[in-house]
Amino acid sequence: MKINFLFILFLIFCFPVHPANIQILNDIPGTGKTIINHSKIKVHYKGKLENGTEFDNSYKRKKPFSFQIGTRQVIEGWEIGLKGMKEGGKRTIMIPPDLGYGKTGAGNLIPPNSKLIFEVEILEVQHPGYKILKVNDIKKVMEK
């Protein structure tokens, strides 16, 4: 039991944490569930280049976007910039190229090395099906 726990801690702490070069330009807090790692979330968003050119808009499509945080379904800037938000919240974030589409860009829509600005509204948050242990819970497990 202790070996499994130590191995999990090893995995958690051995992966480098990317410095969050995300700029939060506007933040309207929500009041619902908080986004944590592996939360399934549903959002509406607008994506723009730094010059104001809109490249994507889920409101215009009238279809929210659903994905799971922490599973690399979206760019890293979204992973970092949305964690901690709450259901009902709205946030405008500026994402540097290295946390967006980088040197390659994304087709004809997003040029290489582009800063991206996203206006995101959190519509729904579903927490993962496992319990997050607190430090005291971990100590109790270690004592057994």
Go through the PLM ranges and name each one.
Residues 2-9, 14-144:
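Cross-family detector of peptidyl-prolyl cis-trans isomerase
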